[in-house]
Amino acid sequence: MARKVVRTKRRERKNIATGVAHIKSTFNNSMVTITDPKGNVISWSSAGALGFKGSRKSTPYAAQMAAETAAKAAMEHGLKEVECFVKGPGAGREAAIRALQAAGLEVNMIKDVTPIPHNGCRPPKRRRV
């Protein structure tokens, strides 16, 4: 019996010049997702996906590495300029934006889209250490 040849589908180059970088920086992790203007994901990365564990995930360096990785993957699809939407209170917000610029992407706009409740859910109880 002949062995079936399994071919993996190679990702095709998307040729997208402008995109949107969604940076979510929480107290525990940093995630960078780069999409086209419609919202379809081109590339993404996070501090945890790069192998940072525990409290190292929340550092600015981890956010910088995540942004760099996502930017390089997006630039393979022809991306040149991005608009940044930053969400969350984490330490890696500015570091991620700087890393996008250092990777060679032109940042056109930076917008803070952190959700702020108009007195919605009750916050978690205070930590006693």
Swiss-Prot record:
| Assigned protein family | Belongs to the universal ribosomal protein uS11 family.
Entries under Gene3D superfamilies matching the protein: Ribosomal protein S11
Taxonomy-wise, where does this protein's organism fall, top ranks first? Bacteria, Bacillati, Bacillota, Clostridia, Eubacteriales
Q: Which GO molecular function annotations are given, in alphabetical order?
A: rRNA binding; structural constituent of ribosome
S-S pairs: none
Range of residues in the leader sequence: none
Listed under subunit, the entry gives: Part of the 30S ribosomal subunit. Interacts with proteins S7 and S18. Binds to IF-3.
Q: Please name the GO terms of the biological process aspect recorded for this protein, alphabetically.
A: translation
InterPro entries attached here?
Answer: Ribosomal_uS11, Ribosomal_uS11_bac-type, Ribosomal_uS11_CS, Ribosomal_uS11_sf
Q: What is this protein called?
A: Small ribosomal subunit protein uS11
- UniProt keyword annotation of Ribosomal protein present: yes
What PANTHER family is this protein classified in?
40S RIBOSOMAL PROTEIN S14/30S RIBOSOMAL PROTEIN S11 (PTHR11759)
Q: Keywords assigned by UniProt?
A: Ribonucleoprotein, Ribosomal protein, RNA-binding, rRNA-binding
Q: Carries keyword Ribosomal protein?
A: yes
GO terms for cellular component: ribonucleoprotein complex; ribosome
What single Pfam family name could you report for this chain, choosing any that match? Ribosomal_S11
**Which NCBIfam families does the record associate with it?**
PRK05309.1, uS11_bact
Q: What exactly does this protein do?
A: Located on the platform of the 30S subunit, it bridges several disparate RNA helices of the 16S rRNA. Forms part of the Shine-Dalgarno cleft in the 70S ribosome.
